[in-house]
């Protein structure tokens, strides 16, 4: 089963908004002024997730804008997962409001459809929320099914009839086919899931790399990935932190301040997970909304925020041409090692200096832990910053990335 808790939880909090076109939107002042979610009344006017608020207002003049309440979302997600736990312990979260459930071993409670319907009714009765569910023989099609009928509905995709049911759907409906992949597929006349399923392996690998083979496997119903238990902790593969600034960044000094601020959180998470970074990756989006990414290895794996910031900034300075101001910056620690893993030193890194910096950063972190994060900070960060007000919600996705 794949369960999708609808954004109606926001409506549940504000009953006065029922039956009105409503969109949950980010802060305009902090440059998150886009539609994060919308109800079906708003969708009927053509309002879509990801578009700017002004665009949504053009489509629906009476659109009611509400701010997101992440704490409430997490609360209801936790309550819903508590209900799921009555039926199975194989509950794999997928973001804040979606889960996969494996009810293969719950046959005494009924068929997959019957269990899904009982969960749907229970969540509606106990929490006042509607959910949509997909029931299928693998995770990919269960996810697809949960998106096919909304709200308060169940869709079954069976092994002997999935071709007739879903191969006519757009390839972009399939998990793993994002906008960039869809654009490549479309340029070669591959528009539906069925057309993707029939495309040759060599062609897909040539155009999309190994991801092309993965999505073809998905299209043919061959996904065999298991649903993890509710207590399963996914291995951490990378740790990142990104931000959209309140105003565009216009010079290297401003980018340095943002990167230095971002890596403080990354360093804390590396220590919490007892990891060291063997590489750094950065993603830069300009004010034309064009994104470029670069990455490099680090000579000696480290947890030092200062060293990570210097490496990230050097990578940026080497590659970014300043054709446009910058709107958002993301830094990721990649190629992670266990912190007690034996390390082969290279000939070029000043090991003593790095060790001294790591001990200094560890001491600074202890001070912040005891007296608050602003008790001590880099002098350059005391100047006026273009960073938005902090709002932190940590989510662990199935990829193992924390951010």
What kind of region is each of these model predictions?
Residues 64-65, 290-294, 341-342:
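Short small-residue beta-strand/loop micro-motif enriched in glycine and branched aliphatics
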Residues 94-98, 136-139, 275-279, 324-328:
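Short Gly/Ser/Thr- and Asp/Glu-enriched loop/turn motifs at secondary-structure junctions
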Residues 313-370:
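C-terminal hydrophobic structural anchor segments
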